Design a protein with these regions (language model features):
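ATP-dependent adenylate-handling active sites, centered on carboxylate activation for C-N bond formation
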Residues: 8-13, 135-138, 142-145, 153-156, ...
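Short histidine
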Residues: 18, 64, 74-138, 248, ...
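Short, polar/flexible loop-turn hinges at active-site or ligand-entry regions and domain interfaces
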Residues: 87-92, 108-111, 175-182, 321-322, ...
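Short acidic/glycine-rich loops and adjacent helix/strand connectors
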Residues: 33, 85-86, 289
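PAPS-dependent sulfotransferase catalytic core
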Residues: 386, 447-456
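N-terminal glutamine amidotransferase
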Residues: 1-73, 77, 114-218, 229-236, ...
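Polar, surface-exposed loop/tail segments
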Residues: 33-36, 95-99, 432-439, 452-456
């Protein structure tokens, strides 16, 4: 994870009191921190080096094009940047995030800004929260663009005071000195603010690549292959890293599939971690998976006292009072602390997502209709950034690590939602996540007891 932080100062107010808040995000990017002023815009970035660990990828990126200057920061990973670089001949090297401002320059020079926005629906594969500021030849701010990925895997908050400042930060704790209303920047949104004679703001929604209606598939053989391919593709994209990768393994089907498929793709033992209390069931099932896939497995135990002691920082870290999120965050916080302080891993693969995407909560058995189940699933995914997505991001980034969430990949979501809702509803014939499980049935990827382990 990285931390982005910026202020557009509209009326020359004294913003010195806000600058200390920039350092509240340091844990998100322990490798390099930079804060710079461009005209009336303050741009800060804390970097966790994952792709291209050299200083060449330190942000903010400053690009000069004819009579304009582009200043760009991004907390994200663009997994298909090499393909895009080759297609457009942009020469981004090994810096994945640099592809976005390079594409912006290319499209605004040759096509339109609307065509640039469409790339986020159709071409750019990854998760991101970014700020892009464009200055004219007189170094005046002419426009700026703020964007966040389709389900909000990467966090972003904003404060807008029409008379004084626009404020953007990866976490709310980067805005503690601001006494106005803090809002979460909406997932799946690109916002453009034009700053010429008068300010004009327009928002584009990126939902069409997953939330649009698609023809439903009911051929079970086709379903299994499509789901299997989508899962493998989503995981494969996230295995690209210049830093070591850890895998959280609870023994549930979600994290177990991520670990098992990754082990096959990598072709050598991976490093798995399970966290729990003595007597818990997760440890037993996680060990079963670890033995089956031959991983280097670590068990991290904590006591009730240690869990309670961590609560205060868990609440500060997750920035929520939601009791379910806090309860579920304690274990992830403690295992992330272990990985961050006792290993050299910097990327953490997690299994969040299928409960929402696949309608896997036990109450889904009682959905009144297939189509209400479909609607409910989409609503849960739209809100996942406030709950499980928040937990995965904050608990992992708290210790200078990056969480990757393959089951929130747009390809997987779109593929699973293309299954006819009548086949997705859990019942006496199809258990929850049936088609996710069925896609890997009979491959000896996981023990049958794990692959078909019912959600507890």
């Amino acid at each position: 994870m990285c931390g982005i932080w910026s202020i557009v100062n509209k009326s020359n107010i004294d913003i010195k009191k806000y600058l200390n808040d920039f350092w509240n995000l340091k844990n998100r990017g322990p490798d390099n921190s930079h804060l710079e002023t461009f005209s009336n815009v303050y741009v800060g970035f804390h970097r966790l080096s994952i792709m291209d660990t050299s200083f060449n990828s330190n942000q903010p990126y400053v690009l000069h094009d004819k009579n304009r200057t582009i200043v760009f920061t991004c907390n994200g990973e663009i997994y298909n940047y090499k393909e895009l670089d080759k297609e457009y001949n942009l020469n981004v090297g090994t810096s994945d995030c640099l592809i976005i401002p390079k594409l912006y320059i290319h499209y605004t020079n040759n096509y339109s800004i609307d065509d640039f926005i469409k790339l986020f629906n159709d071409n750019i594969k990854g998760e991101f929260a970014f700020t892009l500021y464009e200055f004219d030849e007189m170094k005046n701010l002419s426009k700026y663009i703020i964007g966040r990925d389709h389900v909000g895997v990467r966090p972003l908050y904003c404060c807008t005071d029409n008379n004084n400042i626009d404020f953007y930060s990866s976490e709310m704790k980067g805005m503690l000195e601001y006494d106005g209303k803090i809002q979460e920047f909406p997932p799946g949104t690109i916002k453009i603010v034009t700053n010429n004679l008068f300010e004009y703001s327009h928002e584009y929604k990126l939902y069409s690549n997953i939330y649009s209606n698609v023809p439903f598939e009911d051929d079970t053989k086709i379903i299994s292959k499509k789901v299997r391919d989508a899962v493998i593709n989503s995981i494969k994209r996230r295995l690209v890293s210049h830093r070591p990768i850890a895998f959280l393994l609870s023994g549930g089907v979600d994290s177990s599939l991520v670990a098992a498929i990754s082990a096959k793709l990598i072709g050598e033992p991976i490093r798995t971690f399970c966290c729990g209390m003595k007597g818990g069931t997760d440890m037993k099932y996680a060990k079963m998976v670890a033995d089956h896939i031959g991983s280097n497995h670590t068990e991290v135990y904590f006591t009730e006292e240690e869990g309670l002691k961590a609560l205060e920082d868990v609440i500060y870290t997750t920035e929520t009072w939601d009791t379910t999120t806090i309860r579920a965050s304690v274990g992830q916080y403690l295992v992330s602390k272990y990985i961050g302080t006792k290993t050299d891993c910097k990327v953490v693969m997690v299994g969040e997502g299928p409960d929402e995407v696949c309608s896997s909560y036990l109450f889904n058995y009682y959905a009144p209709s297939f189509y209400e189940l479909d609607s409910c699933s989409k609503e849960y995914v739209k809100n996942i950034h406030m709950y499980d997505g928040r937990r995965a991001d904050r608990c992992v980034s708290r210790f200078g690590l990056e969480a990757r969430v393959p089951f929130l990949d747009a390809e997987f979501i779109r593929t699973y939602w293309s299954i006819c809702p009548s086949l997705r509803k859990p019942n006496n014939i199809f258990m929850e996540k049936h088609w996710l499980r069925k896609a890997f049935d009979g491959l000896n990827l996981l023990p049958e007891k794990i692959l078909w382990r019912k959600k507890e």
